[in-house]
C-alpha cells in the first residue's frame, strides 16, 4: 500500500472513531429528551404562550415583555424544541461523517502529488500560544511558584478537534487542564480545619531517560449536593445568530435543564440573554421551579450579533439584587465565541469581573461549539475571565460533558472551599540538578507573590482534585541538560550545607502551600518536605493515578511538540494509560485512551504530508 492509500486509511479510521463518539453522545441526548417528556403532554398539544405562562404561579417572576427580548420566540412545544435539538445533534454527526467520508473516497483517485486534502476547514478560533516552561537549574533558581488551576476547557476543546479529524495547533494545549480534567483517588482531608489534603509521589519519568517525575496532588473535602447551601445563579446565555447550530444553543438549553434539575427551593435562578441587545428572561425564580425554567429556555432562539459586555453587566446587577449571604453567588456565562458588538475591550471585561469577584460574585464560563466563517471561539478570553473571577472554565461539546460539569461535579462547580491557593516548591541543589514544571505556563507567579496576600490565585471547589507534575534530574543523573559552571564552588557549598543542616541533606524539595479560607483575608501556610526515600525504583510501582496523570501530561506535551520530551511516543503513552485505568466510574479514562489512539492515527497521517500542513491553524 503506497503512502497515499495509507494516509486515506488512517483518515477513514479517525473519522469512524470520531463519528461513533459523536453519534453516541447525540443518541444519549435523544434518549434523555424522551425520558424528560411529560407523559400527560400530548405530542400535538400546543404549549401556552409566554404571556399566559407568566400569569401562573410557576412563572410569576418572568418578565411580561419576554417576547420582545432578543433571542426569544413563541415556541408552541417547549419540550419538543429540546427534543428537536437532540435530533439535530444526531443528524449533524451523520452529515459530518458522510461528508468527510465522501471526501476521503473521492481523494482515493487523486495523484500522489495532490496534497491539498484536509479533514476539516480551517477555523478562526482564538487560542493563546503557550510558551513552554524551560528546564531550570536548581543551583541558580531553586524556587518555583504558581497558582493552582481547575479549568478543564483545553481538554474538551482538544477532544472536539480530534473527533473532527484535526490535531490542535502546537503550543495551544494547556497541559494542566488535560491532567486536571480527571479526578484522582487522593485521600480526603483528615480534619475540617484544613480544606484540602496534600500528597506527593516520586517515580521514574516516562518522558526522558534517567529523570524522575514528582507529582503533587491536592483534594478538597467533599460536600453532598443536598448539603451545598443556597445558591444564587444567573445564567448569562448567548443567543446570537452564530449559536443556531445543533452543538450550540440546542445543547446549551439541554445543559441548563440538567443544571436546573439539581437545584432546590432555597436556590435562586435568573436568566439573562444577549445578542444584538440584552434582556432579562427570568428574575430570581426558585431553583425548584422547573416549569418556569424549562419554559423560558424553550423560548430561546439564535439571532443577532453578540453584545456580551452589556449582558455581563446586566447579569451582575441581578446577581447583586438576589445576593445570598454565606451562599454561592455566581454568574454562569455560556457562549460560542467572542464579544463582537458594543464595548469589546477584553482587558476592561477581565478587570470588571475581577472587581465583582471581590464583592462575592464569581463567574464560571462554559464554551459551546467552535467557530466557522466570520464566527470565532475565544478560548483565551473565556479562560482569563474565569481565572480572574474565582470560577472555572469548561468547554461543553457533548451531553456527557454537560452532565460531568453541571451534575456529577456540581459541588465543585458551585462551592468554593478555599481561594487564592498558591504552590511554592524549593528544590534542594544538593540533590536536584534540574527541574521542569509541566504546564501552568499562564499561572506562574513571582517568588515574592507567594507571601503577598494581595496577589490573586486560583480556587479549589468541594471535591476537586488538583495535580501538578515536575520532571526532575538528580545530581547523579547521566542525562543532565545543563553543564555545571566552571567557576562556582557548588559541590563544596552543598557539602557544607549538608553538615549544617543534616536533616535536609536527603530532601529532594520543600513544598509550601498558601490558601485563604472562605471569608478570610489572611492566608494560611502549610508545608511538606519531600524526601528521596519516597523515590520508587520503577514506574510500574507508582499508583494508577500517578501513571495515568503521566500519560495525560505526556499526550499534551506531544501535541505541543514539547522540546523537552525525547523518550516517549503515542504507543508508549497508550500502553501506560491502559495500565492505569483504575476504577474509572464514569468511563472518562477509557474515553481518553480512545482519543489517544485517534490522535495517534492522525499523527501518522499528517507525518505523510508536508510539515507545514501537520497542524491545523487556529
Where are these regions (language model features)?
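C-terminal motif of bacterial Sec signal peptides marking the signal peptidase cleavage site
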Residues: 21-24
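Charged, compositionally biased N-terminal leader segments and the immediate start
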Residues: 30-36, 50, 76-138
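Post-signal peptide N-terminal segment of mature Sec-exported envelope proteins
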Residues: 32-83
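Long, acidic serine/threonine- and proline-rich intrinsically disordered regions
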Residues: 137-140, 153-159, 415, 432, ...
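Bacterial N-terminal signal peptides that target proteins for export
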Residues: 2-12
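Acidic/polar low-complexity segments with low predicted structural confidence
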Residues: 128-212
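Exposed acidic/Ser/Thr-rich ligand/metal-binding surfaces
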Residues: 26-36, 62, 196-420, 441, ...
Amino acid at each position: 500500500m503506497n503512502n497515499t492509500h495509507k494516509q486515506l486509511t488512517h483518515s477513514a479510521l479517525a473519522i469512524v472513531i470520531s463519528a461513533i463518539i459523536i453519534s453516541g453522545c447525540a443518541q444519549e441526548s435523544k434518549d434523555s429528551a424522551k425520558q424528560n417528556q411529560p407523559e400527560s403532554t400530548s405530542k400535538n398539544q400546543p404549549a401556552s404562550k409566554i404571556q399566559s405562562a407568566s400569569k401562573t404561579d410557576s412563572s410569576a417572576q418572568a418578565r411580561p415583555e419576554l417576547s420582545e427580548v432578543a433571542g426569544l420566540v413563541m415556541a408552541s412545544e417547549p419540550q419538543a424544541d429540546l427534543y428537536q435539538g437532540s435530533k439535530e445533534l444526531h443528524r449533524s454527526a451523520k452529515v459530518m461523517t458522510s461528508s468527510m467520508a465522501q471526501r476521503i473516497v473521492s481523494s482515493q483517485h487523486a495523484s500522489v502529488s495532490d496534497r491539498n486534502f484536509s479533514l476539516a476547514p480551517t477555523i478562526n478560533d482564538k487560542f493563546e500560544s503557550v510558551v513552554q516552561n524551560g528546564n531550570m537549574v536548581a543551583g541558580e533558581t531553586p524556587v518555583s511558584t504558581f497558582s493552582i488551576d481547575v479549568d478543564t476547557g483545553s481538554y474538551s476543546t482538544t477532544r472536539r478537534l480530534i473527533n473532527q479529524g484535526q490535531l490542535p495547533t502546537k503550543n495551544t494545549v494547556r497541559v494542566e487542564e488535560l491532567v486536571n480534567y480527571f479526578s484522582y483517588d487522593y485521600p480526603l482531608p483528615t480534619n475540617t480545619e484544613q480544606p484540602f489534603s496534600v500528597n506527593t509521589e516520586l517515580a521514574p519519568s516516562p518522558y526522558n531517560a534517567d529523570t524522575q517525575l514528582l507529582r503533587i496532588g491536592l483534594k478538597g473535602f467533599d460536600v453532598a449536593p443536598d448539603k451545598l447551601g443556597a445558591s444564587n445563579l444567573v445564567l448569562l446565555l448567548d443567543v446570537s445568530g452564530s449559536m443556531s447550530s445543533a452543538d450550540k444553543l440546542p445543547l446549551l438549553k439541554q445543559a441548563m435543564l440538567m443544571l436546573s434539575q439539581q437545584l432546590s427551593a432555597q436556590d435562586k435562578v435568573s436568566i439573562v440573554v444577549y445578542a444584538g441587545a440584552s434582556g432579562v428572561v427570568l428574575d430570581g425564580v426558585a431553583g425548584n421551579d422547573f416549569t418556569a425554567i424549562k419554559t423560558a429556555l424553550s423560548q430561546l432562539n439564535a439571532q443577532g450579533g453578540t453584545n456580551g459586555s452589556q449582558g455581563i453587566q446586566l447579569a451582575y446587577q441581578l446577581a447583586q439584587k438576589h445576593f445570598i449571604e454565606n451562599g454561592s453567588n455566581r454568574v454562569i456565562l455560556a457562549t460560542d465565541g467572542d464579544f463582537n458588538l458594543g464595548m469589546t475591550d477584553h482587558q476592561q471585561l477581565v478587570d470588571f469581573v475581577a472587581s465583582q469577584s471581590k464583592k462575592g460574585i464569581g463567574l464560571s464560563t462554559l464554551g459551546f461549539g467552535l467557530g466557522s466563517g466570520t464566527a470565532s471561539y475565544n478560548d483565551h478570553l473565556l479562560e482569563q475571565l474565569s481565572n480572574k473571577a474565582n470560577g472555572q472554565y469548561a468547554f461543553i461539546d457533548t451531553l456527557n460533558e454537560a452532565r460531568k460539569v453541571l451534575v456529577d461535579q456540581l459541588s465543585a462547580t458551585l462551592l468554593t472551599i478555599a481561594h487564592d491557593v498558591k504552590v511554592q516548591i524549593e528544590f534542594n541543589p544538593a540533590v536536584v540538578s534540574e527541574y521542569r514544571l509541566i504546564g501552568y505556563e499562564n499561572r506562574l507567579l513571582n517568588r515574592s507573590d507567594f507571601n503577598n496576600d494581595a496577589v490573586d490565585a486560583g480556587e479549589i471547589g468541594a471535591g476537586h482534585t488538583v495535580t501538578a507534575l515536575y520532571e526532575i534530574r538528580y545530581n547523579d543523573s547521566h542525562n543532565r541538560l545543563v553543564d555545571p559552571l566552571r567557576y562556582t564552588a557548588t559541590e563544596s557549598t552543598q557539602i557544607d550545607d549538608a553538615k549544617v543542616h543534616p536533616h535536609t541533606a536527603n530532601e529532594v524539595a520543600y513544598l509550601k502551600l498558601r490558601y485563604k479560607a472562605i471569608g478570610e483575608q489572611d492566608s494560611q501556610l502549610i508545608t511538606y518536605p519531600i524526601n528521596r526515600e519516597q523515590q520508587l525504583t520503577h514506574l510500574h510501582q507508582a499508583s494508577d493515578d500517578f501513571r495515568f496523570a503521566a500519560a495525560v501530561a505526556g499526550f499534551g506535551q506531544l501535541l505541543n511538540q514539547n522540546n523537552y520530551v525525547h523518550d516517549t511516543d503515542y504507543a508508549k503513552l497508550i500502553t501506560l494509560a491502559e495500565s492505569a485505568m483504575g476504577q474509572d466510574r464514569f468511563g472518562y479514562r477509557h474515553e481518553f485512551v480512545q482519543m489517544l489512539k485517534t490522535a495517534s492515527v492522525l499523527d501518522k497521517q499528517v507525518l505523510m504530508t508536508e510539515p507545514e500542513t501537520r497542524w491545523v491553524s487556529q
